[in-house]
C-alpha cells in the first residue's frame, strides 16, 4: 500500500502479479478442463476497493478491479460452453489483519456498515459455495459485494 506518486514500479508490479496475473495463470490452466466437461464455475476474489477504489491503495485497488474485469470477460468468452465466472468483493472482514487496527479505526468502519459489524470469513465462504453450486446456475458475470451493506 502507498500513495500512487510515492509508489515504485516494483511495488506496483508485485501486487498486480500476485493478485491479477496469478489468477489469469490459474484460470488459463483450468479453463480447458472446464470447457471439455462443458461446465464449471470460476470465482475471482476481488474486494470492495476494486469496485470503489481507495486512496493509498492504487495497486491493490487496480488489481482487484482487474479481477472483476477478468471475471466479466471470461463469463462472456466461456459462457457459451457452460462455464460461469463471477467475482466476490468482500468488505470489512474480521481477520488477524483487521484485528490489529486501532479501536477508533474499527469504530469508524462499523459506522459505515449498516449491519454494524464486520463480516466473518465464513460469510465469504458461503457466497463462494453458492457460486460454485448449481443453485447459481444462472449467475454469471456478476460482482457480489459481501460487505454488510457498506456499499449500496
What are these regions (language model features)?
Residues 7, 53-61, 73, 101:
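Active-site loop-to-helix junction immediately N-terminal to the catalytic Tyr of the SDR YXXXK motif
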Residues 32, 76-80, 137:
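Alpha-helical segment proximal to the catalytic Tyr-Lys
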